[in-house]
Amino acid sequence: MSEPIKVLIAIPNMGYTQVEAYGNRLMNFMQMGNFQTEKQTFARFADVLHELAPEKAEAVLNAYIEKHGRYVKKIGEELFQFYFVNIGRIFTPAAREEAAKKAVEHKMDYLYMIDDDMICPDDMFQRLYKSMQQSGADIICPLAFTRNPPFKPVLYASIEGWDGVNKSDYFINNVVMNYPKNKLVESDACGFGAVLMKTWMFEKLQAPWFMSSEGTGEDILFCYKAKKVGARVFMDTTFNIGHLGHPQIITEEFVENFKKQVDVDSAKRYPEFTKYAALTILGD
């Protein structure tokens, strides 16, 4: 029997997660199998710890989860082993950096990150993994949108060049507003509201991978660097995840209605995305 595929799961958490995300995240993880520990059930362990040493419970539980907590799940013909890392409430790029370090340290095959303000389908991992196999992607994200008007998709095409004054490369990101729908869309970068990525890129790139003084988001910057070592970046627009706003969850349906009712000229301002040929999902 072949070795399980090892996946590290992390939730970059700034400490202000809306409660709407809690139940959704629980359902996401329940799809990945039954929680297992080496000696006793986690629930029993937590109860005993809170009873005997409440002042130390949180720190000990965090260490216990990181060392022993894992899910094992068979998807199709492949066996997956899921590990959860508790990073804590820190700056999101720093949280991604720590997750990547753990993925490299423990020889994970994939890193799977879900931001703490996203509402996702229960079977999102299965969908992204299947799409990754179909497309040959090294980084794949579901369709998502910014939380504020005009609610842009976090899908980007880049223009690269050489800065003769500073003697350095530069790149400019352009949002792909009219993206191909129900396709696997190859792109230059995508937002990491949720992302599944292979870990070989961390070995090829020099750390820090996400922390930077650049004036662009850490997710876009990582995609730019990863493509330089041969990675392919895709967005799966066959489904979308909700971005928790106030008070609205920003989904594709909400954005389409916003364009029709408020931003009626948006289709005239943005061209169709043609830089890469989008892949049709099998079965279409």
Features from the language model and the residues they span:
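Short, high-confidence coil segments that cap the C-terminus of an alpha-helix
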Residues: M108, G136-A137, A231
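C-terminal catalytic/acceptor-binding lobe
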Residues: T199, K204-D284
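N-proximal low-complexity "stem/linker" segments adjacent to membrane-targeting elements
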Residues: M1-N86
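Active-site nucleotide-sugar/metal-binding loop of Leloir-type enzymes
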Residues: E97-Y110
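A short, glycine-/small-residue-rich helix N-cap motif at loop->alpha-helix starts
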Residues: I90-A95, T216
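Hydrophobic pocket-lining residues that define ligand/cofactor binding sites across diverse proteins
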Residues: A103, M132, A226
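Conserved catalytic core of nucleotide-sugar-dependent glycosyltransferases
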Residues: A100, P121-M211
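Short beta-strand-to-loop acidic/aromatic patch adjacent to the donor-nucleotide binding site
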Residues: M108-I119
